[in-house]
Amino acid sequence: MTGTTRMKFLIEQEVLLQQYETRQNEHEVMRLLHPDFVEVGRSGRSFDLQSILELMKNEEPSTGKIHSQSFECIALEPSVQLLLYKSAWVDSKGSTSLYTKRSSVWVFTGEKWQLKYHQGTPCEPFRIEVESTI
């Protein structure tokens, strides 16, 4: 897999995890998240895999969505990739809030890529790009 192909694939996986339908499918979440997964949310709270699964299970559908943009992929090792990007919450009326800088560490387990670490940090508002891909 080339660097560009890997980056596109990891972005697709990251965006999948932002979708309510994916988050309600425990089998799919387990495919995407590493058993040792840890998240530090934008609130500063830490979550492990079990607490994230519980949160996702109890999540209610929403009329808004997460918009992601400005992706950058940095190879820490061939099997460890750091994905950086910005996100914002877009409500059903198109208003934006919860501007966040995000970082995700994806690891290749020998069989598949899994998200091992994710962190969201609040940031200043930024201009929303129409295209959210590379």
Identify the meaning behind each predicted range.
Residues 2-31, 36-134:
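A beta-strand edge to alpha-helix "cap/lid" segment located at domain peripheries
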